[in-house]
Amino acid sequence: MHNVSCDNMNNSPQGRLFVVATPIGNLGDLSRRAIETLTTVDLIACEDTRHTKNLCRHLNITTPLISYFREKEQEKAEQLLHLLQAGKQIALVSDAGTPAVSDPGAVLVTKAREAGIEIVAVAGPSAITAALSIAGLTQTNFFFGGFLPANKT
């Protein structure tokens, strides 16, 4: 069984990795638990520090930020893994939605899991479930194949 939990209690000398979902359009969608997590961790690893800085400023969160973007994901994952092993509590966020779901994060989550680091899911807004909820469909099964490619014209 993997070290994955849903609470903010820590009984381990190692750090924990919090995978925190962020708003997909309305800052009011961020949960109290996500705000508490972002406020109390030692470091926030984010896809784009400029974007996350705006979110933190809006919520008066002063936790230090470190960039964690796709082009440097392997290198940054190693750096963050060392911090986790040293006992740091780290939140991982993407610009909008859930890290590792069509956004950076899977490499760090995998490395943390392999190293025995506890991983805590802090659920939040989801574009796909929001779209399904208002589509009027009665489907119980669906497939998410990722985002459409960016229009380059």
Predicted segments, located by residue:
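Glycine-rich, flexible N-terminal cofactor/catalytic loop recognition
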Residues: 2-70
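Generic beta-sheet signal
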Residues: 16-20, 87-94, 142
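Short, glycine/charged-enriched secondary-structure capping and boundary segments
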Residues: 33-36, 58-61, 80-82, 104-109, ...
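Phosphate- and divalent-cation-binding pockets in alpha/beta enzyme and binding domains
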Residues: 54-55, 100, 129-131
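Short, structured surface patches at the beginning of a domain
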Residues: 57, 69-82
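Conserved helicase motor
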Residues: 66-75, 147-152
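Glycine/small-residue-rich loop that forms an oxyanion/phosphate-binding "nest" at active or ligand-binding sites
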Residues: 77-126
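Class I SAM-dependent methyltransferase SAM-binding "motif I" and its flanking Rossmann-like core
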Residues: 107-153
